[in-house]
């Protein structure tokens, strides 16, 4: 990609109200610019001062940044701390009885847990893990429903220095096995079932299936939380019930004091080569990013009630459910269910009931709720809201305006946040009391984040032209490496084209005349479906694993609810099916992908051809397939196409 023309033109702008600005922690654009200047002029002391102010250290650090082995950066590396201590223990003296979590189950039952109670539960479970032989540096895979126990598990791992790797509960047995195998996990923590939308979904059965596959032999124990009355198949000697494990365990557990650069967790994200990437985050740098961005981006105040709707299986649930809110001593809502069960007013009812003041959700959820009409939110008292946020993908301006007017009543700033699994915390977003917002733009980088848009040579592109989004200086919460694959880390994020100097985000973007950033999409073959990144190669590999399939190529096309829909172009081993036969095979392949990877990756559209469009060198012409998927006129040069006759076949929907 050199540069791209920007198609989206948005001129509407919304400044923070005088009342909001007056009460904001960072108030007015001058305050924002002052922080940016401070970071630009004294970069290391800027981050060092924040780390000293916000983190409780067992042993203070003496050096802020070691970049001698760039791009393997080390921050605060001689400091000693514990993430769980920073999220729990340090709040007990003044806020032991403050509510930490308001958990609402799928059926509406509400459980409130104080910081004191959460600390007790974490210590007991941490001691339980220690009784299973889990020690500092061991990897624990977490395959749990959204709930208090998921947070307890993650915090317990952090407390004893174990490295957690949370796997989204919708992933298949094969995906769970792949992550167990790559991490070398010794323990899996799961539940017998999860409950979503009134339906029980088996989790332990999926773990059992994963552990029966080759490559999962490292697992010694499976801890099972009994979420429902449903049973679970049992392997004596390996499986242990959660309630039995914590029985009689001490309610105190001394934290394992960790080096600042010791790994806190691994979170797997999709890669364009098919093999998931184990994104490894450090203890201190990651914690600082989550902690500080939470208070800045959401203008957090001690009496706020925060609700992030993300699952802990994704980075948003790590940074803005498990770590950011708790490190700030916040009260937050955690929700097990879905926004449309038992009816489409569920989100609004919960905001009213729990007096939520900061609401952070995905554009996918907003778009799905828009389809149900504007009357529904108006039936609820949403006056407690003061900040709205979006995450996971760019939000289209129309959805932004609906969110702003219908949900926020035209008084709540919207923080459209751009960041990634790899960045660990928010990078570009409006500070709500300082920056005027524009529908569809994530606006300006946070102070201390040196973001830019460049062409293939690394030169800055002019406003209105698209290019590569890069971050030019290291920052504390940046991914440290890809687990067990440092070469892939360098090649993916610090490529030779930029002399290894810039972090390449993998997104294209442009800047407008005010310097605001507008995200345009992915530059690689990773799809963004409902805010979740899915590798095309993983889906293609799953399709080709079906005995009927010879070859497959997967691309995305715009979808009004999910952001992107999965479109698969498939060549069968037998003849190209047509009519009802094609529909039958397509249905079978969709179910196959759902089983192999998870429902989230299920193709929305499958097209059959006798072949795929390839260059004479055998390379699949994916840009051509994207045009076909979108129903666009083919304008690409097809002179190098080996088999132009198959284009007509692939343009025919079922």
Swiss-Prot record:
Residues where Mg(2+) binds: 544, 549
SUPFAM superfamilies linked to this entry: Acetyl-CoA synthetase-like
Binding site for ATP: 392-394, 416-421, 507, 522, 533
GO biological process: acetyl-CoA biosynthetic process from acetate
Purpose of the protein: Catalyzes the conversion of acetate into acetyl-CoA (AcCoA), an essential intermediate at the junction of anabolic and catabolic pathways. AcsA undergoes a two-step reaction. In the first half reaction, AcsA combines acetate with ATP to form acetyl-adenylate (AcAMP) intermediate. In the second half reaction, it can then transfer the acetyl group from AcAMP to the sulfhydryl group of CoA, forming the product AcCoA.
Family as reported in the entry's similarity comment: Belongs to the ATP-dependent AMP-binding enzyme family.
Name of the molecule in the record: Acetyl-coenzyme A synthetase
């Amino acid at each position: 990609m050199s540069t791209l023309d920007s198609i989206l033109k948005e001129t509407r702008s919304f400044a923070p109200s005088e009342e909001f600005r007056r009460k904001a922690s960072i108030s007015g654009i001058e305050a924002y610019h002052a922080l940016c200047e401070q970071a630009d002029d004294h970069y290391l002391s800027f981050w060092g001062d924040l780390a000293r102010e916000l983190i409780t250290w067992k042993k203070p650090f003496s050096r802020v940044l070691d970049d001698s082995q760039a791009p393997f950066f080390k921050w605060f590396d001689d400091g000693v701390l514990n993430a769980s201590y920073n999220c729990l223990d340090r709040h007990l003296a003044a806020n032991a009885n403050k509510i930490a979590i308001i958990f609402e189950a799928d059926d509406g039952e509400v459980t409130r847990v104080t910081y004191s109670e959460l600390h007790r539960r974490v210590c007991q479970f941490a001691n339980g893990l220690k009784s299973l032989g889990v020690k500092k540096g061991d990897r624990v895979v977490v395959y749990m429903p959204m709930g208090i126990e998921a947070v307890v598990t993650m915090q317990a791992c952090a407390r004893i220095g174990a490295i957690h790797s949370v796997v989204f509960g919708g992933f298949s047995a094969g995906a769970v096995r792949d992550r167990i195998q790559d991490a070398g996990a010794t323990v899996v923590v799961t539940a017998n079932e999860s409950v979503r939308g009134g339906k029980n979904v088996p989790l332990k059965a999926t773990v059992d299936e994963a552990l029966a596959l080759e490559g999962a032999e490292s697992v010694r124990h499976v801890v099972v939380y009994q979420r429902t009355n449903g049973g679970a198949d049992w392997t004596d000697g390996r499986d242990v019930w959660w309630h039995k494990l914590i029985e009689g365990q001490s309610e105190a557990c001394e934290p394992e004091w960790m080096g600042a650069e010791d790994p806190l967790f691994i979170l797997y994200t999709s890669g364009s080569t098919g093999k998931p990437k184990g994104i490894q985050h450090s203890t201190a740098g990651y914690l600082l990013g989550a902690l500080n961005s939470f208070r800045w981006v959401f203008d957090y105040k001690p009496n706020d009630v925060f609700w992030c709707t993300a699952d802990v299986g994704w980075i948003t649930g790590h940074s803005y459910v498990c770590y950011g809110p708790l490190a700030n001593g916040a009260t937050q809502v955690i929700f097990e269910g879905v926004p449309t069960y038992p009816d489409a007013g569920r989100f609004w009812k919960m905001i009213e009931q729990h007096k939520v003041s900061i609401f952070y959700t995905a554009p996918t959820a907003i778009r799905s709720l828009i389809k149900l009409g504007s009357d529904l939110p108006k039936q609820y008292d949403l006056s407690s809201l003061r900040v709205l946020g979006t995450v996971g993908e760019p939000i289209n301006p129309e959805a932004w305006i609906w969110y702003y007017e219908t949900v926020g009543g035209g008084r709540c700033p919207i923080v459209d946040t751009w960041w990634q699994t790899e960045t660990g915390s928010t990078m570009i977003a409006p500070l709500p009391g300082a920056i005027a917002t524009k529908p569809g733009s994530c606006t300006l980088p946070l102070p201390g984040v040196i973001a830019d848009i460049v062409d293939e040579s690394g030169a800055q592109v002019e406003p209105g032209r698209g290019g590569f989004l890069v971050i030019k200086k290291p920052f504390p919460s940046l991914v440290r490496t890809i687990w067990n694959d440092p070469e892939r880390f360098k090649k993916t994020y610090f490529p030779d084209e930029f002399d290894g100097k810039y972090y390449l985000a993998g997104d294209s973007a442009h800047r407008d005349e005010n310097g605001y950033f507008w995200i345009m999409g992915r530059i690689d073959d990773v799809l963004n479906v409902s805010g979740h990144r899915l590798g095309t190669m993983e889906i293609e590999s799953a399709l080709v694993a079906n005995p009927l399939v010879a070859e497959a190529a997967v691309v995305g096309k715009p979808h009004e609810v999910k952001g992107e829909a999965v479109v698969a172009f498939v060549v069968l081993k037998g003849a190209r099916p047509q009519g009802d036969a094609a529909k039958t095979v397509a249905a079978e392949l969709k179910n196959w992908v759902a089983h192999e990877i998870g429902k989230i990756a299920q193709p929305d559209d499958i097209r059959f051809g006798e072949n795929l469009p390839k260059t004479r060198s055998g390379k699949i012409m994916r840009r051509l397939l994207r045009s076909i998927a979108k129903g666009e006129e083919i304008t690409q040069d097809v002179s190098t196409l080996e088999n132009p006759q198959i284009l007509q076949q692939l343009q025919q929907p079922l």
